[in-house]
Design a protein with these regions (language model features):
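Conserved C-terminal helix/tail region of periplasmic/extracytoplasmic solute-binding proteins
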Residues: 42-130
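Secondary-structure end/capping motifs
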Residues: 1-66
């Protein structure tokens, strides 16, 4: 509950601190099931040695997130719907407008801590950098 309200306890016994935008639920397609995010999660599992990289495994991971169901559920509402189902993860440096099938959508910076971007079409190259 505190995370959703942007009030985070940083240390035991301290009062929660207000951290604006610690977690947002809808803006910038935060809850959209990007296939590229499923692919990135799979890549992290491979990097950590939790799974062995395989074509069928990678394909299965990408089928887990269902943007088709999300779009069907929100069709005709005010919810902006991205036109793409995958994107370059960690590649947005500044607020950028993205193509939609419904509404207007701005995506904010999403850089990863290590500065690397993840292209779901370049899994082998990404893993080779690990």
């Amino acid at each position: 509950e505190r995370a959703i309200s942007d009030r985070i306890t940083l240390a035991a016994g301290q009062e929660p601190v207000h951290i604006p935008d610690f977690m947002f639920q809808h803006r910038e397609a935060a809850n959209f099931p990007w296939v590229s995010q499923a692919a990135w999660l799979y890549a992290q599992m491979v990097r950590a040695g939790h799974v062995v990289k395989s074509g069928p495994g990678y394909a299965a991971a990408q089928r887990v997130f269902r943007p088709d169901i999300y779009r069907a559920a929100f069709a005709g509402t005010q919810v902006p719907l991205p036109g793409a189902s995958a994107k370059l993860e960690g590649g947005i440096n500044e607020t950028t407008g993205v193509g939609t099938v419904q509404g207007r959508l701005l995506m904010g910076p999403d850089r990863f801590f290590d500065g690397r971007a993840f292209d779901p079409d370049q899994l082998d190259a990404y893993l080779a950098q690990s």
